[in-house]
């Protein structure tokens, strides 16, 4: 007589083998084709964003007439410093405080350091920097006057 346990084991093995073959065949038939890694592995890149330029630089040239509030220089940091009749914005933009003519000049700050300045003067022939002993020129009621000149009321 055949051992019943052996028969069951052999029968179970054959069933298992048949079911695996069926699953293998059914997987091939039912699943769609898979693309290779050349398509799926696109990856990521970190340095693709190229932003537009910020339009920095000198906006008005030497001896050019400007009105009050006009931007003279847009810059990052203080490559140029504000001189006479100019102001410095919070983003280091230099702008005109009065109407006049643009002048660029350099001054020694220390023995080894020289700074570039931009200023606005009322008369085209005026040069900057002005001597330290010379009084500053201011515009009062559209007339150019000296700072130490006496005004009669």
Curated annotation (Swiss-Prot):
**GO biological process, any:** mitochondrial translation
Region of interest (Disordered), residue spans:
34-57
Instruction: Name its cellular compartments.
Output: Mitochondrion
The transit peptide extends across: 1-37
User: What are the record's GO terms for cellular component?
Assistant: mitochondrial large ribosomal subunit
Which InterPro entries does the UniProt record give? Ribosomal_bL27, Ribosomal_bL27_CS
Identify its protein family.
Belongs to the bacterial ribosomal protein bL27 family.
- Task performed by this protein: Component of the mitochondrial ribosome (mitoribosome), a dedicated translation machinery responsible for the synthesis of mitochondrial genome-encoded proteins, including at least some of the essential transmembrane subunits of the mitochondrial respiratory chain. The mitoribosomes are attached to the mitochondrial inner membrane and translation products are cotranslationally integrated into the membrane.
Q: Which NCBIfam families match?
A: L27
Recorded hits in PANTHER family, A to Z, give: LARGE RIBOSOMAL SUBUNIT PROTEIN BL27M (PTHR15893:SF0), RIBOSOMAL PROTEIN L27 (PTHR15893)
Q: What is the protein's given name?
A: Large ribosomal subunit protein bL27m
Q: Which organism is it from?
A: Schizosaccharomyces pombe (strain 972 / ATCC 24843)
């Amino acid at each position: 007589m055949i051992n019943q346990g052996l028969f069951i084991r052999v029968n179970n093995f054959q069933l298992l083998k048949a079911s695996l073959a069926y699953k293998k065949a059914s997987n091939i038939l039912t699943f769609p084709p898979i693309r290779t890694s050349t398509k799926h592995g696109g990856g990521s890149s970190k340095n693709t964003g190229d932003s537009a330029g910020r339009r920095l630089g000198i906006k008005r040239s030497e001896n050019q007439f400007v009105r009050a509030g006009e931007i003279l220089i847009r810059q990052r940091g203080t490559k140029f410093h504000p001189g006479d009749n100019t102001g410095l914005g919070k983003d280091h933009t230099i702008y005109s405080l009065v109407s006049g003519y643009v002048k660029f000049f350099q001054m020694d700050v220390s023995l080894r350091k020289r700074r570039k300045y931009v200023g606005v003067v009322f008369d085209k022939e005026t040069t900057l920097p002005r001597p330290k002993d010379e009084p500053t020129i201011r515009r009062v009621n559209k007339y150019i006057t000296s700072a130490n000149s006496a005004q009669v009321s």
